[in-house]
Amino acid sequence: MTQVAKKILVTCALPYANGSIHLGHMLEHIQADVWVRYQRMRGHEVNFICADDAHGTPIMLKAQQLGITPEQMIGEMSQEHQTDFAGFNISYDNYHSTHSDENRELSELIYTRLKENGFIKNRTISQLYDPEKGMFLPDRFVKGTCPKCKSADQYGDNCEVCGATYSPTELIEPKSVVSGATPVMRDSEHFFFDLPSFSEMLQAWTRSGALQEQVANKMQEWFESGLQQWDISRDAPYFGFEIPNAPGKYFYVWLDAPIGYMGSFKNLCDKRGDTTSFDEYWKKDSDAELYHFIGKDIVYFHSLFWPAMLEGSHFRKPTNLFVHGYVTVNGAKMSKSRGTFIKASTWLKHFDADSLRYYYTAKLSSRIDDIDLNLEDFVQRVNADIVNKVVNLASRNAGFINKRFDGVLAAELADPQLYKTFTDAAAVIGEAWESREFGKAIREIMALADIANRYVDEQAPWVVAKQEGRDADLQAICSMGINLFRVLMTYLKPVLPTLSERVEAFLNSELNWDAIEQPLLGHKVNTFKALYNRIDMKQVEALVESSKEEVKAAAAPVTGPLADFPIQETITFDDFAKIDLRVALIENAEFVDGSDKLLRLTLDLGGEKRNVFSGIRSAYPDPQALIGRQTVMVANLAPRKMRFGVSEGMVMAAGPGGKDIFLLSPDDGAKPGQQVK
């Protein structure tokens, strides 16, 4: 049964680093993990990697909203994402970030090669600009009506209804997502990837037969409508990698995001001290296999742009794309108000990971069909299949083996032909796992479980146990049941890793695909302990209620200094150097007639006197208390004429205003007139 070992690199689409993992994400990661675990069981060398997609304006703006830096936000998100995936036993060899040195180097390398090969074009474009926020609007921050299918409320780069891609300027009735303002047009020089140059190569790849039929058909539609050059640059302000030799221009997030697959693998190789595998897997003539598990909403990027970028920069193309559909809950789109928009972490507070892994697996196929998580059906199916059919098979037999035979199984099989029926099914079940026909694999396994339970029903060990002189029969029957259980759990091991660990502990034997040909005979098992508990609708109700409460909590406004007053746009060192900050001694402080906000300060700069009006009266109702205190002032601010006189600078203070204003003071020892650097 052993196959020739293959070298396989598997990826999942990179989760965006501005939000939590939810059950929609988990479909893909579970699907990929089941496939990867099966490949590993068959002896293949599998590298399973992922990363956070950590760039783009949405992350920059979300960080501002939270009052933290983008780097801090993506760091916290990465930890949260990795915790969630570990909780669902997603067996990644490496989880990285697109905001990494490896990804920067590879993005610059691929861009440079594309440019050297003539595939990067420059031209000035008219771009949507938010006049209220003073920024160019990235694709995802413009919404309007799709120019192709006329669906409303679609983003500026692609339509989630028909899958079309387009320029934000093509949207009908566009609006800024940031401010709600109607964008205006402004010119900007942008860089374009010449996708049409790869049309012939992409069509040949499509016709190769490797892609899912639905994907190939969709690509053919795109070819017929004509491929367009792809805008790969964005203007500052932008959180990402600056394009080499192009100040103020950044790589569009969708350029460096798929390169993140390469970056994560490079990071893994470096961790291992492996200097050869990266080139071995990614060189143009590599014989390693590369598979991307993705959702149907990002097929365009992975089936057109990504292979074309790789081809144009002399790297290998993917072996295949494995595309899945969306997740609905109880027959409808996931809803925050109904409590069906469920985060991965919330699920794990109410159910184990194996339960969702099993339910998704039972519904998955190689097609791009949506999967419905019907919560009532979920409870019934987990109890009927995992508990009643599989685990119950072990519990019905293990007690007799433990109590009557000291845990030792019979030396011979009671029904070798029946056992062969189970092991012969390995070919069909293995092919179903291989071809991602997961639902078929589960149906085959559950059909065998029915046969195994029927065998136990017919042999009735509970009756035999009461009959004198039939100990050997009892041991043989129960040993047969446990061996059939072992085969079933071997087939289910890619799906149920936690349960499999418990089963291996009970059997005192690893669940190994190639070992099922040899049954456990004369083998001592350990004391049987409950392997899996039934679930009920009360847990579902608690899950839904928890999700609703989390939505309410998340809707509470974020407060704090950075949230209330976000950090301003970045300035250069030269800009900062223009500001001349000096230590100043407050010689006098007094109220200003006609103003309930200002104090008049007389400042000594160590040989020069300044008159400054400062709006700090609400925090310092007794101005005399300021006399003799040192502070910091902007000494080279242009004088400002006011109706009370001329203000010759500005003193520095912190706080939101009102009584919460705090005049800055240097440490003891500072002298009036000294420069603050």
UniProtKB/Swiss-Prot annotation:
Transmembrane segments: none
Localization terms from the record: Cytoplasm
Reactions catalysed: tRNA(Met) + L-methionine + ATP = L-methionyl-tRNA(Met) + AMP + diphosphate
GO molecular function: ATP binding; metal ion binding; methionine-tRNA ligase activity; tRNA binding
Entry binding sites for ATP: K336
A single BP term in Gene Ontology: methionyl-tRNA aminoacylation
Cofactor(s) listed in the protein's UniProt record: Zn(2+)
Presence of the UniProt keyword Aminoacyl-tRNA synthetase in the record: yes
Keyword match Isomerase: no
Residue positions of motif 'KMSKS' region: 333-337
Motif ('HIGH' region): 15-25
Keyword annotations of the record: Aminoacyl-tRNA synthetase, ATP-binding, Cytoplasm, Ligase, Metal-binding, Nucleotide-binding, Protein biosynthesis, RNA-binding, tRNA-binding, Zinc
Entry-linked InterPro entries: aa-tRNA-synth_I_CS, Anticodon_Met, Met-tRNA-synth_bsu_C, Met-tRNA_ligase_1, Met-tRNA_synth, Methionyl/Leucyl_tRNA_Synth, MetRS_core, MetRS_Zn
Cellular component GO terms, alphabetical: cytosol
HAMAP family recorded: Met_tRNA_synth_type1
Similarity field: Belongs to the class-I aminoacyl-tRNA synthetase family. MetG type 1 subfamily.
NCBIfam families cross-referenced by the UniProt entry: metG (TIGR00398), metG_C_term (TIGR00399), PRK00133.1 (NF001100)
Protein name per Swiss-Prot or TrEMBL: Methionine--tRNA ligase
Gene expressing this chain: metG
